[in-house]
Each structure stands twice: as C-alpha cells, then as structure tokens.
Amino acid sequence: MHWSEIIADRIIKRNPNKEEYVCAAGISPSGSIHIGNFRDIATSYFVVRALIKKGKKAKLLFSWDEFDRMRKVPVNVAAIDSDMEKYIGCPYVDVKNPFDTEEKTYAEYFEHEFERSIVKFGINMDYRHQAEMYRSGKYTEHILHSLKKRGEIFDILASHRTQPVQEGEREAYYPVSIYCSECGKDTTKIVSLSDDCTQAEYTCACGHKGSFDFTKDFNCKLAWKIDWPMRWMYEGVDFEPGGKDHASPHGSYDTSKDIAKKIFGYEPPLFQGYEFIGIKGTTGKMSGSSGLNLTPETLLKIYEPEVILWLYSKTEPLKAFDFCFDDGILRQYFEFDKMYSAVKDGTANDAQKDIMYNTTVGDRELETVPMGLLVQLGSVVDFNVPMLETVFEKIGTPYKSEQFSARLDKAKYWLENCAPDQVNRLRAGRNWEVYETLNETQKAEIKSLFEYISAGGYDLDELNKKLYAIPKEINGEDLDEKALKTIQGAFFKNVYKLLIDKEKGPRLYLFLFAIDPQRYVGLLDFSYPKTEEEAKAEELAKVEDVVENEDKHVYGEADAFVPFKDEQVSIDAFEKLDLRVCEILKAQEIRKSHSCLKLTLDDGSGENRVIVSSIKSEYTCEQLVGKKIIVIANLEPARFAGVQSNGMLLAATNGACGCQVVFVPDCVPAGTQIK
C-alpha cells in the first residue's frame, strides 16, 4: 500500500463519517517559491488523491501566508530595487511590487508566479489568502479568545522551551502582533490591555503611540504557533505535513497541537514530517527569501511534471531524494520511463501502480523517448528536429517530432545550462594535436576506420562489429581478451578525441551511423599535411583556453581594514597550535548542507583525516582534489551538518576576492608542520 493511502486510512479511522476531508498546505510568499516548499503541497495532494480513491470527498486547502511580516529582502529582489529594505516588518501583502508587472503587490507577484507553475502539474487547490481572512474580521473572535487565554498560552509555550521563564515575562506576553497604523510595521509592543481584552495601547519603534480596538481594527496577526492551530480549527483541517524541523520534539507541531487542544478545543490534524530536498549539480542555499532558489518553474525546464511528481510519490516523506542538475537526471528519466511503460503495458506490480497513480497530469499521454538518447544525439545535430527524425529512422527507432519535441526542449536546456561539458559537437577541423601523440599502430587504426567509412555500404550492425574488429586487425589476432579490450578502449577514446574533443561520447557505432559521414569523415583523414588554416585555428584555440581559464569570479570592493587585535599572543601560546600541510584526497558535497564540503585529507600520519569547510560556493570538488592546504590539526572536533570535523583549513575572506583557501606548493610533503 502506498504511503499516502496509509495516511488516508488513519484520517478516515479518526473521523469515518466526515462529509469532506481537508488536507492543508501553506507557504509565505517571501520570494520565489522554491521546490523544497513543493513537498508540502505534493504530500497533501497525494493524500487527497488517496482519500478520493477510497470513495471519500476531499480537498487540498492552500494558505498564502501573505500576512506574515517581511523578514529580509531576497538577493534577486535587492538587485532590482535597493530601496526594498524599508518594507522589512510590513506584511508581504503591503509591500510594493518591485517588478515591472501588472501585479499590485510583492505578495501577489510571487503568488501568481507559483500558481502558474502549479497549473502545469494538474493540481487543483482551494486558496486562502490570509491577509483577506484577517482584515475581513473572520478571525476576530478567535483573536479575542487568544487574548483572554494569553496566560495559558504562555504556559504551553514555556513548557516546550528549554530556557527558564524570566520574572515578569508571563505578564508581558501577548499572542498577537499589531501592525502600526503609522508605519505599517509589526515593530510594536502592547503596553496595556483592557480587562475584556478588546482595547489595547501600543507603542512602535517608529515612535508612534496608538490605541487598538480588536473588535473593529483588524490589522493584527496571531503569532505563528497560535495562528496555525487556530486555522486548523477554523477550516476543520484533518491532515497537514511540514518540514522535519516542525516535527522535532517540542517543535512547532508539538506546541501547536497542545494549543489546539487546550485553547481552541480542537483535535489537531494528523501531521506528517518530511525530509528536505537535495539538489545535485548546483550550489547555493535553496530558499525563497535568499534569492538563491530553484522554483517548480525552473525544474520544469528540465523535468516533465510527471517525473517531478513521480520523485515525490515514490519517496516516503521522511526519506530524502535529489533533484539532479548533473547527469543523474538521465538515470531518473530512465527509471521513470521503465515504470511508466510497465504500468502502460500491464506488467507493473501493485507498488509501481500506486506510485504512478499520483503522477498523472490530466489526460496527458507521455511518449517515453529516451532522454539519454535525445541528449546524446540532439547536440550532434544542433537540435534540428527534421535531422533528428532522420537519425532515429537510421538507427531503427523511427520516433517522430511530435513524440520527442517536448523532451528535446528539456534536453537542450539541460545540456546548455546545466551540463555544457556534455555537449557533443563535431570539430571544425582535424585534431593534429591529438593525432601527433598517437603511435604508428594507433594511426593505422584511424586510417582503417577512415577507409571503411569512406567506402560506405554498411548497416548499423556491420559498423558496430567493424569498430571492435579494427584494433584486432591492426594489432594481430593473438591478443588475449584483456589486452584486446584495453586496445579497443584506447581506439574508441582516440576516435572521440579526433571527432568531438572528448574521450567519450554517445555510443560510437550509433554516433557514426546516425550522422551523415560527409560531416565527419574528413576529421579522420590525415593523408595530407596540416593546412595553414588549421595551424591558425590551433593558435587561436590556445589563446581562448588561456582566457577561459582565467578567474571568472566577479567580486566587489575590498573590505575596510580591520585594526589589529590589542591582545598579544605569546610564543608558547602560538606553539599550542598544530598547523599541518595536508593533501585533499577526496571532496564531497554534504546533502544536509548548502555551504559545506566534506574533505578527506592525507595528513601524513598514515590515517585519513576528515574536515568540514564552508567553501562550497567558491570551489568545486574537482578543483580541490589533489591540492595541498594548511589545517589546524589539534582543533577540538566539532560536528557540522551531521559530519564530525577534525580540524579547520586556513583561508582568507574579503569582499574583493571572496573566500580563498591558502594552498601550499605540491613539493611540500603531507604532514609537514608549520613552525
């Protein structure tokens, strides 16, 4: 049974005769809504579908928490309008729209952006706009009730925290924030409340002092852990998921659950915590308010909506999975296609059927043209659709444009924006630099292939056999199997390098058969000398390589000089530090961290050392492996993102250069002490 059906059964068991079940989700429009938030929606959506599958009426209630205060300005928003910080403290619904669009407010802009992408998933939601709910007075009686119960609410909150209650803290607590009538911000403090809890006096950080009548003035909002259970009660919510941080002991759900029962007299909904989403192949903290985010719309440029839903459906909520911007996406498409086809042809098991049940988008029928094949062959024909149709016809898979055009767009976007190193393009001229490194036997292999291709008259199977036969024909028939495989592998690499400047590419026999031989056969012909044009092209390529390898980072101005510390350190104190040269053997991304890398080091002791460093935004793993660095080796171990770090590397951080690790010349042995 699918995990969503297990949850649905629990919901029905709690209240078997309810007319309509309510599954909830909600997001604050702090910026572009990132894909991590989408798990909130997907989890509730699948439970709604499971309830409907069981013959029940159910809806997905979605709250736009646009009445929340603006906490900070996302980086991408600040880049458009540097004056947005003045809105910090105002509700999102009152913040201006900094973009040149028709939406009236900041909240509306990001809400519409997200809603447009949700339509593409075929998900129907019943929207609640919390600013309208509060300001229309619909929550007034519950706000008054909360004010009357403020002492009890404080006691519940205090029971879920570790720090002791300070004297006078309970008396000064109010479960509601007032938005100032003068500046519009929530930087207010209630200084008095009438006995019937209807009238309040408040002061604001802006200097304004005012009166507030909770029966007539609605520009106020309950604190999060009171607002949440109040809305459960108001909407009759039966189920709501949340990030695993909310699910922790004494976290938001535990606290709100107690408030729902003891303050609002409502049995809290079933809650399902979920693991956060990982991102492979890109960096940057994934959050809406930081500006470094990956929205559903962004993912839809490389993923079909069904594949995104499939990833959520096949993964239990408390298990992590990754969206892949590297070639892991090709594996995901392959696995999706395999399961989709099994369901379609009737060979799927019950578990596969349950997973795929949640992935349908309206009446869409998918064509499972292999994404890997589109990636491999698409770039070779410059994503020309008629040419690709011809290629597919030649290799015995006669897909038509209407079958692959949608996926082809995603393959092209992925290659050009996420994996440009995997683009396969034929060279403009012969690769003399590679050819001149070959020995005579290898050159003879290339000549044999050139002659075979030039002669033509072969089919796909004959070409495949010939590619494996050429090394054997040139090197002799008496090679053992291991030696033959080594020579064949080297031959394939040489052909790839001569044709596309890479050591590997699409399956070679498909590649050579699919493309018009006249486009590439000349690249294998070294029977005449290097031309003047080829010599000039080589020189130009060397210059371009130098330019390409120059530092591409764009930094700002240097930080202001920080005065030296007054406190001096004695030689004895300095000698307590054990600074060692270490070689980086392995660098790995840490799934739970958006900024840290796990580095495995050779510290000269004979046993590897592991440290964690927040340099992910500055260096790729490939750039670090093999480098030598300086590490404080006797630093007290500490845990970061679930990994124990046994030391700290030395690096310089400045606005003019970012974070630059101090590297050591390769001639210095690992384990050398810095004295």
Where are these regions (language model features)?
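N-terminal catalytic cores of NTP/NDP-binding nucleotidyl/phosphoryl-transfer enzymes
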Residues: M1-A78, P229-S248, D603-E607, V612-V625, ...
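Conserved oxyanion/phosphate-binding beta-strand-loop segments in alpha/beta enzyme cores
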Residues: M1-E19, F212-W224, V581-E589, L599
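A glycine-rich helix N-cap at a beta->alpha junction
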Residues: D81-E103, A107, F114-S117, F121
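Active-site cores that bind ATP or allylic diphosphates and position pyrophosphate for catalysis
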Residues: I123-P296
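Catalytic adenosine-cofactor/nucleotide-binding cores of aminoacyl-tRNA synthetases and other
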Residues: S248, Y253, E275-P420, I500-L540
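Helix-rich, typically C-terminal accessory recognition domains appended to large enzymatic cores
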Residues: L373-T390, N439-V521, F526-Y528, I632
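Small-residue-rich helix-loop
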Residues: V391-I453, L460
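Phosphate-backbone binding interfaces of nucleic-acid-interacting proteins
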Residues: K536-K675
